[in-house]
Amino acid sequence: MKYFILSLGCTKNQADSEVIMGILESKGYVRSLNPEESDLLIVNTCGFIAAAIEESIEEILNLVHLKKPGQKILVAGCLVQREGKELAKHLPEVDLFFTPREINNLDKLLADLGENNKLVLSEPGFLNLEKKPRAKSNEVYRYIKIADGCDNRCTYCTIPAIRGKYTSRPLDDILEEIKDTLKQGIKEIILVAQDTTAYGIDLYGEFKLVELLRKIGSIKGNFWVRLMYLYPDKITPELINEIKENPKVIKYVDVPLQHIHPEILKKMGRKGSSEEIISTLERLRKEIPDITIRTTFIVGFPGETEEQFNYLLDFVKKFKFNRLGAFPYYREKGTPAAKMKGQIPKKVKEQRYEKLMEVQQEISLNLNKALVGKKIPVIVEKKIRGENLYLGRTYMDAPEIDGIIEIKAEKRLKKGQIINVLITDYDIYDLKGEFIND
């Protein structure tokens, strides 16, 4: 028996998909990359924004079009949590819709898989507290979900409604999964949650990310720990010091800011003032000079004036983020922002997005140019054309969202090997370099 799975959306969804895969493989299923030869066709959907919903529905319809007698289609994930009843009504070809928490019951759902499509809904959120098996979809890195849900109430965001209240995993459970992951040969641990900095507050009554990092740091071995989704209002001096001093924690932080103008931040429901945010960012750079700071911005939020957008643009020019992503604002039903006055025309939002990314591209090009001649820690991902060329990522680059580096090496390199590379060439986002055998 074979299964085909397509995981859409965020890193947390990828972690959930690997649990689905692990359950299936424990039952004897073998993963296939070809849906036409598979018995089970699975889409783990994203329901965050309109574009993600459209992509999810398009992929479901693609599988419906391919479906042959005897094949079963399963649809999971956030879109089922958000729009399950509508999906089941309009897609009778799908055999099973189930929400993230129902991954715990996947064994039973598969056993009960009948001829008619079925919808199984539950409370939002999934943390695999039952320790279901997890498959390995990548040999180099793994996303470790330390919490699910969100208690922040950003006015544009649907996540609290889809994933539920913020729920942390027990610290020992996380450490156990990390140790098991390292035993499998994976060398990069990426800690993720909707708000990684809030870890532990619901479970222990206080923030526990620093303690978690210290305990991870005591695990033997040569591996990286990467931090994603840090909220600026919870980046404490203690956390900054731990990132600085812990040799396992690479000097990279993903800090989604969404905006910097005080009035827009207030309308977004973001915590912390512009001054506090800037102070935190400056402290990160002062304490850890070689740190890479990634952020994300939303342009075209309701009521955003040209002056407020230029305020954001000037800030980006001045601060020079190492990595930056941006999105035009999406009007999501059920959110306070969707009802706000001053909705920005699509064309204006797109123009602002293009303008921001043009500024960032110039910044990125200059930052990469400055790396030429320097030695940078790199993790090897795979071998490419020729006998001595490999692809990897510097510590400054997270998988899928940041750049890559082409490595020339006279000796054979292994996947997951952490090496020093001399930077020899660059473009806007990517680098080239030579392996230095120190």
Swiss-Prot record:
* Provenance organism: Carboxydothermus hydrogenoformans (strain ATCC BAA-161 / DSM 6008 / Z-2901)
Q: Where does [4Fe-4S] cluster 1 bind?
A: 10, 46, 78
Q: What is this protein called?
A: Ribosomal protein uS12 methylthiotransferase RimO
Per its UniProt entry, which superkingdom is the organism in? Bacteria
Reactions this protein catalyses: L-aspartate(89)-[ribosomal protein uS12]-hydrogen + (sulfur carrier)-SH + AH2 + 2 S-adenosyl-L-methionine = 3-methylsulfanyl-L-aspartate(89)-[ribosomal protein uS12]-hydrogen + (sulfur carrier)-H + 5'-deoxyadenosine + L-methionine + A + S-adenosyl-L-homocysteine + 2 H(+)
One Gene Ontology MF term = aspartic acid methylthiotransferase activity
Assigned protein family = Belongs to the methylthiotransferase family. RimO subfamily.
What region holds the TRAM domain?
369-437
- Where is the Radical SAM core domain positioned along the sequence? 136-366
Say yes or no: keyword Iron present.
Answer: yes
- Relay the cofactor remark from the entry: Binds 2 [4Fe-4S] clusters. One cluster is coordinated with 3 cysteines and an exchangeable S-adenosyl-L-methionine.
Supply one GO BP term. Answer: tRNA modification
What are the UniProt keywords, alphabetically?
A: 4Fe-4S, Cytoplasm, Iron, Iron-sulfur, Metal-binding, S-adenosyl-L-methionine, Transferase
Keyword rRNA-binding in annotation: no
Q: What is its main location?
A: cytoplasm
Tell me the ranges covered by the MTTase N-terminal domain, including all copies: 1-115
- CDD domains assigned to the protein according to its UniProt record, in alphabetical order: Radical_SAM
Cofactor(s) of this protein: [4Fe-4S] cluster
Protein location: Cytoplasm
